[in-house]
Amino acid sequence: VHYIRSRMGEEPASENETKALIRIIQEYDGRGLLTFAQSGREIIYYHCQQGVGSLPKSYRLARHMQKSSSYHLEREQMTESAREKFKGMGTPEQYYIQTKKQPAFRIKVPAQSGNGRGVEEDKKAVYEEIHLLPLEYIFSLDN
C-alpha cells in the first residue's frame, strides 16, 4: 500500500479517477469534450499539438458557444518551456483532442463567493448562464 500511495501522481494514469476517465474516452466515441472548472468566465478551446487540422472547427464551435453566453473566448496557450516541463502530462482536454481528434473545451465559470444563501443564489446564476452551452454545442456540430 505504501508503494502505491508514494507513486500516485508520478506516472500517467496513476490515480483511479484518471484511469476511469481514460477508459471512458477510449471506449466511447464522441463528437467533443466539454469540461467545467471554476475561475472566471471563459471558454477555452484546445488544439492538436501535432497539427492544426481540428483548430478551425474548434474555433468555430467555441465562437458559437461564446455568442450564446457572456463568456470570454481563449485559445489554449502553452509556451515551449511549459511543454518541456509538463511533457507526458496533460489535461483531459489535451488527451481527448490528441486521441480522438475531436474538439475539446474547458468552460470556466465564476467561483462561488460567500456563505449561506448567497452560495445557492450564485450557483443558480451560474447554471442559468451555462445550462444551454452543451445543447448549443450539439446543435452547432452539423452547421
Report residues per predicted region.
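Short catalytic/ligand-gating loop segments at beta-alpha or beta-beta junctions
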Residues: 37-38, 73-93
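Acidic, glycine-rich loop-and-strand cores that form catalytic or ligand-binding grooves
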Residues: 51-52, 56-77
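Active-site/substrate-binding loop(s) of hydrolase catalytic cores
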Residues: 1-56, 63
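Sec-exported extracytoplasmic/periplasmic mature domains
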Residues: 26-29, 70, 135, 139
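Active-site-adjacent mobile loop/cap segments within catalytic or ligand-binding domains
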Residues: 33, 42-55, 86-143
